[in-house]
Amino acid sequence: MPASCETALQQRCQQIVTSPVLTPEQKRHFLALEAENALPYPTLPEDARQALDEGVICDMFEGHAPFKPRYVLPDYARFLANGSQWLELEGAKDLDDALSLLTILYHHVPSVTSMPVYLGQLDALLQPYVRILTQDAIDIRIKRFWRYLDRTLPDAFMHANIGPADTPVTRAILRADAELKHVAPNLTFIYDAEITPDDLLLEVAKNICECSKPHISNGPVNDKIFTKGHYGIVSCYNSLPLAGGGSTLVRLNLKAVAERSTSVDDFFSRTLPHYCRQQIAIINSRCEFLYEKSHFFENSFLVQEGLIDPERFAPMFGMYGLAEAVNLLCENAGLTARYGKNETANELGYRISAQLADFVENTPVKYGWKQRALLHAQSGISSDIGTTPGARLPYGDEPDPITHLQTVAPHHAFYHAGISDILTLDETIKRNPQALVQLCLGAFKAGMREFTANVSGNDLVRVTGYMVRLSDLAKFRAEGSRTNTTWLGEEAARNTRILERQPRVVSHEQQMRFSQ
């Protein structure tokens, strides 16, 4: 067929299949996305469609026909105990059984990335099956398991949880992660002052100094929302119900909302409520397709065997660009205040978060856990230009670490589906990991629900939720990468100041379509 006769879809597919930097599996993934996006979009009200087309609202490139939930958090403990009739597996009897069963089920857990975004609360899951094994025997098995995950499920949105208790499996995972320094899986330690011993938290801090993992979550804060042990931290720090997950994620560009506002009062009384309503309309439309037309919840063995419950999936009401919105509103009001620099601007930011939280809490959705969406400070996507992720401070001129934490902490109470701020510290912190412990505890005391740190000089760094190796970015365009998130980090490096800013990295979640 002559090139002039090729459709846009054919041209995009041709770019994918001839890409020199994608593996066959990655090409298959992107080709499937192109096919899905060739289908009609779920029916939307006119105002919602306009907001989506103008970029005031973004659907995260999830696809035009949501035939699976964005994030799935199976009840892995139930699976290990009972096995699976569908997979013809008996329950686990020892640690080898448990690890083998998990590696099988992971390949049957769907997500927006086509790989599992949640691996379970691994230490709590595996410890009952350790029995008489020595610590050395546990370490060998966990290290082998960790290497298996990185090699067969190479997606850094894949996320494991550990803590708050101290177990031999907890220590084995920390040792394996520090030694191997893998991009995948990502890791969150759930901290609880009443359960977590001081020496374990110090070990976690040493790991952060070594490989920028794990992320630390304030367990008691999440316990109040989901109840203890009934949630998981997944992907880019999304807090979601266990045995359920996140059905969809749609995000509001607050900068674009501010650009359409004539004043601060107009922003709060007219434009913000208007676009919040349009976002709920998009969420409802996408969830209607998932629940009523895709047949996922009717046919999935995960539902039939009690590993997930359709009523425990929550749509995520995302936002980003708060910093730019605040600065624009201040400028239009004739103020010199800047977000992160002045109390007036910071208070305006807190007011925006509070109004978003109030709207989400008081607006029912057609399909969702407790009939509500969950508010999420979305961490950006790799193609974002000119916006700061979530409620973060603008890049490049962040204040000292303590002021930084005190400034962003008041936002954290509002975002039940997760919020993250990346604190990048000088390499000298490696000589005093106890200082990192104190920063974390101080952040939690100030009200933060999540604590995330990168250490300057480490090759393994965090591009918000997901990890990349800096050494992989330079060679990606020539050689490609077996890890699905390297290309996202490379695109972020081109579109943002990720490699030019102060020691800290920009946060970007998944972009769902291939771009060269």
Region locations from a protein language model:
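A conserved active-site cap/scaffold subdomain adjacent to cofactor or substrate pockets
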Residues: 272-276, 318-321, 326, 330
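Short secondary-structure subsegments characteristic of cysteine-rich extracellular domains
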Residues: 336-359
